[in-house]
């Protein structure tokens, strides 16, 4: 398996991207990595690992650039070069921690959508009390209709099925209340269609339900999804900081911390977003993974692991098959 990595994308590029990629090569003996970036940055890395290939790109799409404009103007950027390699099937997946909007725009323009999907969705995995939950959309589509939400549900169902190894993952529709009549017209219409579908639809879920892991898939528009994602990241960070402050307050709390250190480490690990890799762009014709913009080596390593699992489990073809099998159910 050959994975392409954007070495120039993200807040800590290129150093942490390179470090995470080299670590993945040590850990996974059945992968090759193609690092894409500026020659002056990557030159000399070839000798470090025989399964590492370098592809030079003279441009970088920055986080503050307008996505569509950057994609059209910077054809020799590390991001677009990587997507082109994927289009030509020279690699099996592409991963970037760079500009999210540019990655989505570039993937759409370069690779296109799966037949039957109107809009691709960003699908991160969130840690919960009972395991993990797929959230989609997490920011790609701020305005959605009911048909978009139903399509997100189908893609999320397949993704959770393959990645979590659950035959019938529970699908919930994010809403302001659990009652069927709650929400705007788009959400109400999506509820009716999901209720009629063959998915394991459990109904509406509220924000407070998500951390408890009441379902394996949460469906919403990108505006709401991004707010959920950022809120949960912020809360996890605050809890971690509060625990650290309280447990180091004095000698007695420090002694108590020693007694529960094992449990604290497990909690911290479970709440750490870097443990969950990146978010696939579900609905794109080829495997594209978006790593967190703040990713360091550990997060990049786990995003590569996720990309590998995504390809190994043939998630895209299973999504295509599910879309074809549901047919008219996806037309709202």
Swiss-Prot record:
InterPro entries: FA_synthesis (IPR003664), Phospholipid_synth_PlsX-like (IPR012281). GO terms for biological process: fatty acid biosynthetic process; phospholipid biosynthetic process. GO terms for cellular component: cytoplasm. It catalyses: a fatty acyl-[ACP] + phosphate = an acyl phosphate + holo-[ACP]. Keywords: Cytoplasm, Lipid biosynthesis, Lipid metabolism, Phospholipid biosynthesis, Phospholipid metabolism, Transferase. Pfam families: FA_synthesis. It is an enzyme of class 2 (transferase). Gene3D superfamilies: Isopropylmalate Dehydrogenase. It comes from the Bacteria. HAMAP family: PlsX. Belongs to the PlsX family. This is Phosphate acyltransferase.
């Amino acid at each position: 398996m050959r994975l392409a990595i954007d070495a120039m994308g993200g807040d800590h590029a290129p150093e942490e991207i390179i470090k995470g990629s080299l670590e993945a090569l040590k850990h996974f003996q059945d992968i090759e990595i193609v690092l894409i970036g500026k020659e002056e940055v990557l030159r000399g890395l070839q000798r470090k690992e025989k399964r590492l290939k370098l592809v030079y790109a003279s441009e970088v799409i920055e986080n503050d650039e307008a996505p569509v404009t950057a994609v059209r103007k910077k054809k020799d950027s590390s991001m677009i070069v990587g997507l082109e390699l994927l289009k030509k099937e020279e690699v099996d997946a592409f991963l970037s921690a760079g500009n999210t909007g540019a990655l989505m725009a570039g993937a759409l323009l370069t690779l296109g959508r799966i037949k039957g999907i109107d809009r691709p969705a960003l699908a991160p995995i969130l840690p919960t009390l009972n395991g993990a939950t797929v959230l989609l959309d997490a920011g790609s589509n701020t305005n959605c209709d009911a048909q978009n939400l139903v399509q997100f549900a189908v893609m999320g169902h397949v993704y959770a099925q393959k990645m979590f190894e659950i035959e019938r993952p529970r699908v919930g529709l994010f809403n302001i209340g659990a009652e069927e009549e709650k929400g705007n017209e788009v959400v109400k219409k999506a509820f009716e269609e999901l209720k009629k579908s063959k998915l394991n639809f459990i109904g509406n879920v509220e924000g407070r339900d998500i951390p408890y892991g009441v379902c394996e898939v949460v469906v919403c528009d990108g505006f709401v999804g991004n707010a959920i994602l950022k809120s949960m990241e912020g809360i996890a960070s605050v809890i971690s900081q509060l625990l650290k402050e309280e447990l180091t307050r004095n000698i007695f709390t420090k002694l108590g911390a020693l007694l529960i250190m094992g449990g604290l480490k497990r909690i911290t690990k479970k709440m750490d977003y870097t443990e969950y890799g990146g978010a696939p762009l579900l609905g794109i014709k080829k495997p594209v993974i978006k790593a967190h913009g703040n990713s360091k080596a550990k997060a990049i390593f786990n995003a590569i692991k996720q990309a590998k699992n995504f390809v190994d489990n043939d998630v895209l073809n299973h999504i295509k098959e599910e879309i074809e099998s549901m047919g008219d159910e996806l037309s709202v």
